Regions:
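Exported/periplasmic ABC-transporter solute-binding proteins
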Residues: 20-67, 74-77, 81-85, 94-98, ...
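N-terminal signal peptide c-region/cleavage motif recognized by signal peptidases
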Residues: 14-19
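Periplasmic N-terminal soluble interaction domains immediately after the signal peptide in Gram-negative
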Residues: 90-91
Length: 284
């Protein structure tokens, strides 16, 4: 906590004479949480955060191709690590965790014990995001891999039937103010949608009839979120990244359903321009 207090104090003292704009590229699942984090940072520093949200894999490819991003917050560790390996960014830090849940249409009888059978039912429309483009899809396919150990043949069956409704370059967008996952379920395009628990909670706020079913322990898959600062950006980019890693921002992330990552791991070191060792994350 002492490190976080030091960083918050230094952020307050480091307000530039002219406000700077930080270009944030971030996973779509972080939109609500990082919007609130950005508002807190803007109020503290006077700087502006210009954010673009979308599938982490697509954003990573855009940054790799030269997009003008300053900070990249991904729904996995692999994509920011790839940018670091390309020498396009600094170290990668884990700053939040999530879990996969099943968002289920209102009238479907299902619980954690019967979830796998329901997903395998040929009459049930099972949806995921798009693997490689969106880590949520990669995590969902990891669930399918785990299912193979429970029921031989399950992995192939689930992969073949899964409808990749989100996270692709041409995926349909919901109306303004709707979450894409809840929208697809409401429109009847998915009976069960494997997505982040935070996304499922947001969908349920829009339609309280939609169900959230926890994955059974043998199918459970966690998500780790990685943060990196793109080389060549303004000093305020590093300060904003440090704020995301602070306990103050951690409280905001927690309020949106995320679990803490390695918060405060690098704060004092960054103030002395000696970065802490990056966290080791799980590839998708």
């Amino acid at each position: 906590m002492r490190a976080s207090a030091i960083v918050l104090a230094m952020l307050a003292m480091a307000i530039p004479a002219a406000a700077e704009t930080v270009q944030l590229y971030a996973a779509g699942s972080l939109k609500a949480a990082l919007t609130d984090v950005a508002k807190a940072y803007e109020a503290m520093t006077g700087n502006k955060i210009d954010a673009k949200y979308g599938p982490s894999g697509i954003l990573k490819n855009e940054i790799s191709a030269g997009a003008a991003a300053n900070v990249f917050a991904s729904a996995n560790m692999e994509h920011p690590q790839a940018l670091h390996d390309e020498k396009k960014s600094g170290p990668v830090f884990r700053f939040a965790r999530n879990q996969l849940c099943a968002l289920v249409k209102p009238d479907l009888a299902v619980d954690s014990l019967t979830l796998l059978d329901r997903m395998l039912d040929p009459n049930i429309k099972l949806a995921t995001s798009t693997p490689e483009s969106d880590p949520s899809g990669d995590y969902a396919f990891e669930v399918f891999h785990k299912a193979q150990a429970i029921k031989p043949g399950a992995q192939s069956a689930l992969e073949k039937k899964a409808l990749q409704l989100t996270g692709g370059a041409d995926s349909a967008s919901p109306p303004s103010g709707r979450t894409v996952y809840g929208w697809h379920v409401a429109q009847g395009r998915a009976d069960i949608f494997l997505t982040y628990c935070t996304n499922a909670l947001a969908a349920q706020k829009e339609d309280s009839r939609q169900q959230i079913v926890a994955l059974p322990e043998k199918l459970a898959v966690g998500a780790e979120y990685g943060l990196t600062v793109i080389n060549g950006g303004p000093p305020s980019a590093q300060r904003f990244a440090d704020f995301i890693l602070s306990s103050e921002a951690g409280k905001i992330l927690t309020s949106h359903g995320f679990s803490p990552g390695s918060i405060n791991s690098n704060l004092e070191a960054s103030n002395e321009t000696q970065r802490a060792q990056p966290a080791q994350g799980k590839n998708c």
